[in-house]
Amino acid sequence: MDFQQGLITTIHDYGLGNNDPVAFRQELSRRPTALLIPCLMEEFGRPAIKLIREALSDLSGLQSLVIALAADSAEDVAAAEQFFAEMPFPVHVHWTNGPAVRELLLSVKELGLDVMGPPGKGWAVWQGLGIACQDAEVVGLFDADIRTFGPSYPERMLRPLLDPSHGIAY
């Protein structure tokens, strides 16, 4: 779900948030919730990812953050892990195009299912969802290049999914 697509929206600011960060954190702790951010290594050199990290740094109660990262090297992955090292919840940096993933996907292809696909954010999302869903009932997805990302974004995305009284269920 994305609420920053101009005229086309799926979840926007419907006034569901009560601007009570304590209550929101309690909701997060009642239902295991993860955030997934598909991202290219180049995005770590841009301001948006820093805004996202800053906004999420106060979000205790989150089960995990999954960064589905397209990177050129293990050093890039280590740099991404270091970038998110101080978060108040577990962060898993998944190397979407790393050797282990490529080997796994090639072995699946040999069995007759070609899931190699062209690398990109869509491919990263599918991989990241598998990881995020291991420990979470609710998964929110944000792009890594949202230049207006702020502290209200996680609540606006997740509150309708966390509270069944809003009438949104999957």
Where are these regions (language model features)?
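N-proximal low-complexity "stem/linker" segments adjacent to membrane-targeting elements
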Residues: 1-58
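Active-site-proximal specificity loops/subdomain of glycosyltransferases
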Residues: 14-15, 76-136
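Structural beta-sheet core signal
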Residues: 35-37, 65-67, 170
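Short beta-strand/turn micro-motifs composed of small residues
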Residues: 37-39, 69-71, 140-143
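Short, charged/polar "capping" segments at the starts of alpha-helices
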Residues: 45, 72-79
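Short beta-strand/loop segment that forms part of the nucleotide-sugar
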Residues: 61-73, 92-98
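Short beta-strand-to-loop acidic/aromatic patch adjacent to the donor-nucleotide binding site
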Residues: 135-147
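Conserved donor-nucleotide/metal-binding helix-loop-beta segment in metal-dependent transferases, i.e.
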Residues: 149-170
